[in-house]
């Protein structure tokens, strides 16, 4: 490309000087390796063109995000109220729960996007009782955009710890198990070490 500029007299003196030095250096390396620079350059160009022809357009594209929905539009947009509200901010995520809920079976559902088989962006997560009542929520803060799958995982751990403190049984949806937690016990919820459960419970208890 630079030689074409020089051939068309588009380069200034320093440009032409650098070009001559680089050409001399290339010839020296070519002699050392026993290569003809022009022939090697043409061969390299042909290799690149062949690779691009053989690869399909799909193979060269970045994978697109997938949007997974545990909740219906009604479940996402429904208003809910807390008798004993508790709210905690963890990074760019807001965690809410109703501390009046006790001895319930609760499932966590979420709508989120996935890329490379990992949670990319959480849209909304809510905790539902068997009766369908909403008792907890994790949502991104509009003022602090951006979070990782680890941020979401930690926030879910805080929510689970708070709900379990009141003797509720919590499990997560299949989609969350697959893309957010990667591992779960036989009850469909992430295994939390006893010391982590106690730590989260103490944190929520002290904040009350």
Curated annotation (Swiss-Prot):
Sorted alphabetically, the keyword list is: Eukaryotic host gene expression shutoff by virus, Host cytoplasm, Host gene expression shutoff by virus, Host mRNA suppression by virus, Host nucleus, Host-virus interaction, Inhibition of host innate immune response by virus, Inhibition of host interferon signaling pathway by virus, Inhibition of host PKR by virus, Inhibition of host pre-mRNA processing by virus, Inhibition of host RIG-I by virus, Inhibition of host RLR pathway by virus, Interferon antiviral system evasion, RNA-binding, Ubl conjugation, Viral immunoevasion
Q: Which compartment or compartments is the protein found in?
A: Host nucleus; Host cytoplasm
Q: Name one GO cellular component term.
A: host cell nucleus
Name the InterPro entries for this protein: NS1, NS1A, NS1A_effect_dom-like_sf, uS15_NS1_RNA-bd_sf
**Location of the region described as CPSF4-binding in the Swiss-Prot/TrEMBL record:** 158-193
Describe the processing and modification events after translation. Upon interferon induction, ISGylated via host HERC5; this results in the impairment of NS1 interaction with RNA targets due to its inability to form homodimers and to interact with host EIF2AK2/PKR.
**Gene3D superfamilies named among the record's database cross-references:** Influenza virus non-structural protein, effector domain, S15/NS1, RNA-binding
Sequence motif Nuclear export signal, location on chain: 115-124
Start and end residues of each stretch annotated as Disordered? 184-208
Give the similarity note.
Belongs to the influenza A viruses NS1 family.
Identify this protein by name. Answer: Non-structural protein 1
Q: Which organism is it from?
A: Influenza A virus (strain A/Teal/China/2978.1/2002 H5N1 genotype W)
């Amino acid at each position: 490309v630079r030689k074409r500029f020089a051939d068309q007299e588009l380069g200034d003196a320093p440009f032409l000087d650098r070009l001559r030095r680089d050409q001399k250096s290339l010839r020296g390396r070519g002699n050392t390796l026993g290569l003809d620079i022009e022939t090697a350059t043409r061969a390299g160009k042909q290799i690149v063109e062949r690779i691009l022809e053989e690869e399909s357009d799909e193979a060269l594209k970045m994978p697109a995000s997938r949007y997974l929905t545990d909740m219906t539009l009604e479940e996402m947009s429904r208003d809910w109220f807390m008798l004993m509200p508790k709210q905690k901010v963890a990074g760019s995520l807001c965690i809410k729960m109703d501390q009046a809920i006790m001895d319930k079976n609760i499932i966590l559902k979420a709508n989120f996007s996935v890329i490379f088989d990992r949670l990319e962006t959480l849209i909304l997560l809510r905790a539902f009782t068997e009766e369908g009542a909403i008792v907890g929520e994790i949502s991104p803060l509009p003022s602090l955009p951006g979070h990782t799958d680890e941020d979401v995982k930690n926030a879910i751990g805080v929510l689970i710890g708070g709900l379990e403190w009141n003797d509720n049984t919590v499990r997560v949806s299949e989609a969350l198990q697959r893309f957010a937690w990667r591992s779960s016990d036989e009850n469909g919820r992430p295994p939390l070490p006893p010391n982590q459960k106690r730590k989260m419970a103490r944190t929520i208890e002290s904040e009350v």
